[in-house]
UniProtKB/Swiss-Prot annotation:
Residues binding [4Fe-4S] cluster 2, per UniProt: C94, C98, C101
Protein name, per record: Lipoyl synthase
TM segment ranges: none
Disulphide-bridged cysteine pairs: none
Keyword presence, 4Fe-4S: yes
Subcellular location: Cytoplasm
Cofactor: [4Fe-4S] cluster
Family: Belongs to the radical SAM superfamily. Lipoyl synthase family.
Gene Ontology CC: cytoplasm
Pathway noted in the entry: Protein modification; protein lipoylation via endogenous pathway; protein N(6)-(lipoyl)lysine from octanoyl-[acyl-carrier-protein]: step 2/2
Length: 321
């Protein structure tokens, strides 16, 4: 059996090169076998893209990344056009290789020590009031990147004292307590970590992750910061049943998670996990009713919902679909 070639630092692996390195074989989808997108998933482009160009220019100027671009989010046009963005720190190369995700895999470069300051300056220049900070997985770092998160939060608040910050963190595999110790010095206004799918689908969708570890991360943060909302998100359409999703919602509530996002999985390329089905809006509505009954303070459920989609409105408790 041939061993994978040694990864070179800074080289991005995408599509076939990326998924070739996971234990579950992904068969490239043929066009005739791919499900046709239903009408409710048609993305409307904005009338003006000027704001989008301005935000992209600001990101390029400071060498920053947005998960909106790196993960090929379908809501990029809408969010950018409304002057919001989710910033991705710690580079654009992930040490994991989840086959649902379009972010590149490889050996990341060392963290940019100037990134926290550049990020804070960019947010000030963009006059944002609510930001989401996320990252690639950095299993190569002793703290999983926790200190860099804390540094970014601190610098952002120095230049933007009235801002609200949501963090969408990785699972800090094997380093949960150490990471939370570090983050306790600079806690966010909302703490988000996505479970992504039901536990039965972790082996194919989240190689290297563990369902219970992710639940424990959310619960332990909440135990340390009982007044800070915790949040998690799930994709639908990977082959899970609605009852499996319902059970995940119950698990989240039993681990004191208060905010929820449910959205439709979209296949980034033929080399990624295929869409098993497109979930009708009515089923998202039914799960929204269940989430409310379970006691989530806010649940955004709909085909186009993503974890950071209109995150400011989610934090305010306003309906997002």
């Amino acid at each position: 059996m041939n061993r994978p070639e040694r990864l070179q630092p800074g080289v991005k692996l995408r599509d076939a090169d990326k998924v070739a390195r996971i234990p579950v074989k992904i068969v490239p989808s043929e066009r005739e076998t791919m499900l046709r997108k239903p009408d409710w998933l048609r993305v409307k482009l904005p009338a003006s893209n000027q704001r989008i160009l301005e935000i992209k220019a600001a990101l390029r100027k400071n060498g920053l990344h947005s998960v909106c671009e790196e993960a090929s989010c379908p809501n990029l046009s809408e969010c950018f056009n409304h002057g919001t963005a989710t910033f991705m720190i710690l580079g654009a190369i992930c040490t994991r290789r989840c086959p649902f995700c379009d972010v590149a895999h490889g050996r990341p470069l060392k963290p940019d020590a100037e990134e926290p300051v550049k990020l804070a300056q960019t947010i000030r220049d963009m006059k944002l009031k609510y930001v989401v900070i996320t990252s690639v997985d950095r299993d190569d770092l002793r703290d999983g990147g926790a200190q860099h998160f804390a540094d970014c939060i601190r610098e952002i608040r120095k230049l933007n004292p009235d801002i609200k910050i949501e963090t969408l963190v990785p699972d800090f595999r094997g380093r949960i307590d150490a990471a939370l110790d570090i983050l306790s010095a600079e806690p966010p206004d909302v703490f988000n970590h996505n479970l992504e799918t039901a536990p039965a689908h972790y082996r194919k969708a989240r190689p290297g992750a563990n369902y219970q570890w992710s639940l424990d991360l959310l619960k332990r943060f909440k135990e340390r910061h009982p007044h800070i909302p915790t949040k998690s998100g799930l994709m639908m359409g990977l082959g899970e049943t609605n009852e499996e999703i319902a059970e995940v919602l119950r698990d989240l509530r039993s681990h004191n998670v208060e905010m929820l996002t449910l959205g439709q999985y979209l296949q980034p390329s033929k080399f990624h996990l295929p869409v098993v089905r497109y979930v009708p809006p009515a089923e998202f509505d039914e799960l929204k009713v269940l989430a409310d009954e379970l006691g989530f303070t806010h649940a955004a459920c709909g085909p186009m919902v993503r974890s950071s989609y209109h995150a400011d409105l989610q934090a305010q408790g306003k309906e997002v679909k």
